């Protein structure tokens, strides 16, 4: 058999849990990063999560994280589009992407169909970003600077997303490009 990773749900307030803040990333400074150290942390049986840690938690997390990032950025673009009087079609397309993101968020994050649909969502998102590029000149400097800084978040796991998409297509028996 295959080795199994066990995962536990541990509160950051548990005795023996220490979080050391790390230097922030060059984008989205509102999201903190840190290193966790566990020293003699006591676990109860109910703290151990069921199933295989890698298969059931770590692997699906990347997909769930992608969906949260897309939702957050789409929400931001929607707000900017309304505040700055962008064309209504931009707001409508962005609202559609938000609805699609929500729909995918309730699907199985391990399913090839979810990854293929996520690939389509990402393509639509890229088209929206291209279409809105000139509109950023109509927003205030602070908002535009924040967007330029934070849009790098979309590139963080693009290679991993591309590999998951390729794997999903191969599970359907096609390497369709």
State what each model feature region is.
Residues 1-17:
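A short core secondary-structure module
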Residues 20-104:
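Glycine-rich beta->alpha junctions and the first turn(s) of the following alpha-helix
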Residues 67-177:
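Alpha-helical interface subdomain recognition
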